[in-house]
């Protein structure tokens, strides 16, 4: 059932036809309202007519009309109509919140123009609203008018009495509805005038204590007092829309062509354009933030666990467990002692293999954050490319024979200033306490023959970049000792003919990257160019297929690793590379692509140089988001759901604003003269004839069957004419007056009501009616008016 596609949230309103419920679509996540209409007592023809009309209305596309998504008839006898949700509520409630404080004229005319444009669109489509009132005019959160409940009451209003089902209380009913005339588009203009009067005065244009008095006031033709705090043009426009004779009321099209309205449309148009351009700027800025949001989310939700795994006599390696981690640029990394080798002696190679499998899906991901440009100026001297090593502090040069305790002391000294680029590898404190011994991390692959693996030597210090803030910690995989020995042997052979490098500069806190042969390497950077322009940028670098094959041959993969590897390749490879690196960054990688593993240290340096020398275009960010793994997306979903929803809604509102701007521009271009259609409908003889274009016009009163065109036979013949309701009202009123006064006294009262002198008339009425004057004088006057002006 279509109803199952929505998640019900709460009831937002109830009416005479049913209730309105706020729902959320399970698939697209958008909010809608479902209006449930009770059709249990309606005939099958009436139900079909209501549903067909709802489907017709769902095709209307206008920025000032509530969108209709779908409708269906449930098995419970209810008609369900799904409409767009307006966060600002209805206009009636908005006016009540004013608490007597009048709105500025610009706001009144702004809403007035939007309602008028919606009515003009409906009238051009030959659709009458028939139930225009402030309760059916809604506001979005950007203060845009949405006219709703279009034509739904046409079928339903014929059941029950007029006071409860016609339009609730008929504050907006035009005088012709109480006579032998059908509903016409000029009745919509009357209702529009009532709405504008209510917006200007915060009161109903016609009000009374009871239904009979209200009908009498409307038919009497006595205009309410016009608002004095507004311009005479607005007051005159309201007065013409509330003219008793329909032919004297202007059409909606002519209203929008008046100079007074055009002037306000121009002002509103300029304000809307400015708001739209401002929203566009915000949307452009928000597009540069999703990657940074992912980084900050991971910083809050994830933790690193670093284990020191004892090696064989040939050396030791670093093993890292956990998910991909990204650390914020603002927060320093807490550096604590590592677990001592003695605490991990019980770990076996099999366990290491399992741990490797657990992190295999993300072992190829490198995350790098680049410091904004304002901090580069003071650190440009420290930015060193791989081909140009420069000076480093003597404290950063590590003696090959230094002890573990010396390294620990130097590490603790650097911890005190986490903002300095000399920080070493970041580590979380473990349960072992501060008293446990710790060692610096050494890389899996030495970069030249001068630096040989030694258990007491730290070789994990990479190129120093003073401009780089403490950055994200890339993920390194678990490796078996046998695998490490194989890799070190390969590295010794590889580095035998490579260039020598006597020094290594220290890198801000981050872990060494793993062998980048499996899948993709994501580089997330926050940097600014020399022109102080920049934002979160990101790139995805695919490793070559050859190096991927070489990595698979290094060691046998477990079943879990193979599953993760296959899943990672299926997810990553189709997206393709999103960034083209500069030639300077590609050239150092060429020797390693020929069936040789890439040194982690050199690869990291190449990535750093690439990011420093190459500014990624902003339009590449969208492609980056497709390259993120499921692990990254799942870890950041909760933090980005709302922003994505806001962005989606913001885009929808921006489109609506653009449509509104285009519509107002077209409205300003309307000609000043009446069209042929307007001239034809102003003919009094055809004013209330059931026009052939108005297929959904409701015949409220009279015998017009011979005038109905053939295509109007769609209207249900079982509909009770509106005159039947009025006739019942008059009958009830007549019975009440006759019972209270009697026929003879009622005839005398009718004669006295024809007296021209008001004072003499009232005196004689009091004399004849006595104590009944207060109760029956007004009722007798209403009964006389109905019998003289309303024909049945």
From Swiss-Prot:
PROSITE patterns attached to this UniProt entry: PROTEIN_KINASE_ATP, PROTEIN_KINASE_DOM, PROTEIN_KINASE_ST
InterPro entries found in the cross-reference section: Kinase-like_dom_sf, NEK_Ser/Thr_kinase_NIMA, Prot_kinase_dom, Protein_kinase_ATP_BS, Ser/Thr_kinase_AS
Record keywords, A-Z: ATP-binding, Cell cycle, Cell division, Cell projection, Cytoplasm, Kinase, Magnesium, Metal-binding, Methylation, Mitosis, Nucleotide-binding, Phosphoprotein, Serine/threonine-protein kinase, Transferase
Residues at the active site: 131 (proton acceptor)
Cofactor(s) demanded: Mn(2+)
Compositionally biased region (Basic and acidic residues): 641-657
Residue stretches making up the Protein kinase domain: 6-261
Record field: catalytic activity: L-seryl-[protein] + ATP = O-phospho-L-seryl-[protein] + ADP + H(+); L-threonyl-[protein] + ATP = O-phospho-L-threonyl-[protein] + ADP + H(+)
Gene Ontology CC, one term: cytoplasm
Modified residues (Phosphoserine): 340, 343, 675
Residues covered by region (Disordered): 329-358, 379-515, 527-611, 628-657
Residues annotated to bind ATP: 12-20, 35
MF GO annotations: ATP binding; manganese ion binding; protein serine kinase activity; protein serine/threonine kinase activity
Locations listed in the record: Cytoplasm; Cell projection, Cilium
UniProt entry tagged with the keyword Protein biosynthesis: no
Tissue: Expressed ubiquitously among various organs and is up-regulated in the testis.
CDD domains associated with the record: STKc_Nek4
Family to which this protein belongs: Belongs to the protein kinase superfamily. NEK Ser/Thr protein kinase family. NIMA subfamily.
Role, per record: Required for normal entry into proliferative arrest after a limited number of cell divisions, also called replicative senescence. Required for normal cell cycle arrest in response to double-stranded DNA damage. Protein kinase that seems to act exclusively upon threonine residues.
Name the UniProt record assigns to this protein: Serine/threonine-protein kinase Nek4
Organism, as annotated: Mus musculus
